[in-house]
Amino acid sequence: MAPESLVEVPGCNCFWYLGVLAAAWWGLRAACCLLNGARAWVLGSGAQVGPRIGKWAVVTGATDGIGKAYAEELARRGMSIVLISRSPEKLDEAAKHIKETFKVETKIIAADFGKPTEIYERIEAGLRDLEIGVLVNNVGVSYEYPEYFLEIPDLENTLDKMININIMSVCQMTRLVLPGMLGRGKGVILNISSASGMYPVPLLTVYSATKAFVDFFSRGLHAEYRNKGINVQSVLPFYVATKLAKIRKPTWDKPSPETYVRSAVNTVGLQTQTNGYLPHAIMGWISTSLVPVSVAISMGMKMNKGLRSRFLKRKKQK
């Protein structure tokens, strides 16, 4: 009888090989992530974005935050800018600043994407005959504060508004601009989603779902049209110091819109789905690769319950 230490345990070789394969797989994934990261964050220059793909860039939600920063960055790269937003006064001010600072042409179209009746006919007329190289679908709206679905103030109107602004505007603006890009065989569409669309976020459920739509729509559209010269990118920022996020002072992980956009534009052509900014990319990798979705949802619920309580407490004190 063979000594116990020499007895072969059935299947032990199989488990060893499985372990080696798993380690090799994770090693390969890590290497690919590092390689793609270096390509985007070190070598990226956004060379695909500029007047050579079309004279004009169209930016929705162009008078504040990330939209304004995209308009200015594209103007800095030599593109003429069509600014679309709700307030004619803020549009005039933003257009004047861009024209004087970057010496490019500007055009403004006042439109309230929350009230879509007939606005797309007006936008289509305003864009007619323009050589549009870049479309930035940025306009968006979120909750005033985290809230349970059935307790959202003015729920019916809020749903209509959020779906019209966050989803329908992306589809409709793409419908208007994409044919011209296809006709020339080149163009870039940048759809601003959110890190909230990477996994469900309780108490921001509708907003999170609309941003997940933008991400899926972008990636599907890119697969449909990439062989025809069209580059569609889904941009998923974490917190940026904007009015929408209610953050006033930029930090390393909550950058100014200008810092964020300068970084994000450099990833165009290198990443079809991007968090746009290196610290955000690290947070995105951790939250989707290392943290189980169930844990991310639980953490989101806990954080937003705290934010909700603090908001309602302040409101009651007023």
UniProtKB/Swiss-Prot annotation:
Q: Quick one: which pathway?
A: Lipid metabolism; fatty acid biosynthesis; Steroid biosynthesis; estrogen biosynthesis
Question: What CDD domains has UniProt attached to this entry?
Answer: 17beta-HSD1_like_SDR_c
Its EC number is: 1.1.1.330, 1.1.1.62
Q: Where is the active site?
A: Y207 (proton acceptor)
The record lists its disulfide bonds as: none
- Reaction catalyzed: a very-long-chain (3R)-3-hydroxyacyl-CoA + NADP(+) = a very-long-chain 3-oxoacyl-CoA + NADPH + H(+); 17beta-estradiol + NAD(+) = estrone + NADH + H(+); 17beta-estradiol + NADP(+) = estrone + NADPH + H(+)
Which class of enzymes does this protein belong to? Answer: oxidoreductase
The protein's location, in the record's own words, is:
Endoplasmic reticulum membrane
Location, primary (coarse class): endoplasmic reticulum
A Gene Ontology cellular-component term: endoplasmic reticulum membrane
Q: Which positions, given as ranges, span the membrane?
A: 15-35, 187-207, 281-301
In the UniProt record, does the keyword Amino-acid biosynthesis occur? no
Residues noted as binding substrate in the record, renumbered to the chain? S194
Write the record's keywords in alphabetical order, separated by commas: Endoplasmic reticulum, Lipid biosynthesis, Lipid metabolism, Membrane, NADP, Oxidoreductase, Steroid biosynthesis, Transmembrane, Transmembrane helix
Task: State its role.
Answer: Catalyzes the second of the four reactions of the long-chain fatty acids elongation cycle. This endoplasmic reticulum-bound enzymatic process, allows the addition of two carbons to the chain of long- and very long-chain fatty acids/VLCFAs per cycle. This enzyme has a 3-ketoacyl-CoA reductase activity, reducing 3-ketoacyl-CoA to 3-hydroxyacyl-CoA, within each cycle of fatty acid elongation. Thereby, it may participate in the production of VLCFAs of different chain lengths that are involved in multiple biological processes as precursors of membrane lipids and lipid mediators.
Q: What name is this protein filed under?
A: Very-long-chain 3-oxoacyl-CoA reductase-A
Q: Which organism is it from?
A: Xenopus laevis (African clawed frog)
Provide the organism lineage as a comma list.
Eukaryota, Metazoa, Chordata, Craniata, Vertebrata
Which gene is annotated as encoding this protein in its UniProt record?
A: hsd17b12-a
